[in-house]
A protein has these predicted regions:
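Beta-strand-connecting loop/turn residues
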Residues: 50, 106-107, 129-130
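Bacterial Sec-dependent N-terminal signal peptides
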Residues: 1-23
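Short beta-strand edge/turn micro-motifs at domain boundaries
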Residues: 110, 119-143
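Surface-exposed, charged secondary-structure patches
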Residues: 53, 57-58, 66-117
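Short, solvent-exposed secondary-structure junction/capping segments
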Residues: 30-34, 48-62
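Ligand-binding grooves and catalytic loops that recognize ribose/phosphate and carbohydrate rings
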Residues: 23, 49, 69-70, 139-144
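Short, low-complexity N-terminal intrinsically disordered segments enriched in polar/charged residues
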Residues: 16-42, 46
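Hydrophobic pocket/interface hotspot
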Residues: 32, 44, 52, 111, ...
Length: 144
């Protein structure tokens, strides 16, 4: 009986805590930023669900309006990162890399990322104990 109680308590303790979930969401978002900054597809693969998509808006210099800038799929994101690495098109060393976790539920989470290209709102889901990015909505460039 003592062993059964011990195992039940152990299972409850081993289950991820809200603080661990938040750290894992932050890590997925940092992998996202660093994957694009460094051209590291391994970090992007660790961050994304294969069905991920990213859509965004870029501020038109002439009109000041934010125009739709297109959609990026998982495959396109990996190709973009490869291109960054091949061309050594890395951002400046002081480029922003900020992650703010907005909310974490049992299986869903949201975060705000600030990077050189602008602001991203990210939706994640937890599957098999791992937090992965499902959707990204962004606008840029960031206001100075």
């Amino acid at each position: 009986m003592k062993k059964l109680i011990f195992l039940i308590v152990l299972f409850i303790v081993v289950k991820t805590s809200p603080a661990q979930d938040k750290q894992q969401v932050e890590k997925a978002c940092m992998n996202y930023i660093e994957g694009f900054y460094e051209g590291d597809t391994t970090k992007l693969i660790a961050a994304f669900k294969p069905t991920m998509y990213k859509i965004g808006y870029w501020k038109n210099k002439n009109t000041g309006a934010y125009d739709f800038d297109g959609q990026m799929t998982y495959r396109q994101a990996l190709d973009y990162a490869k291109n960054v690495k091949e061309k050594k098109n890395f951002p400046k060393s002081d480029a922003p890399k900020k992650v703010e976790v907005l909310d974490v539920g049992n299986t869903i989470a949201s975060a705000k990322v600030t990077a050189w290209w602008g602001i991203d709102y990210i939706l994640l889901s937890k599957q098999n104990g791992k937090w992965l990015i499902e959707q990204v909505l962004w606008e840029g460039p960031p206001e100075k």
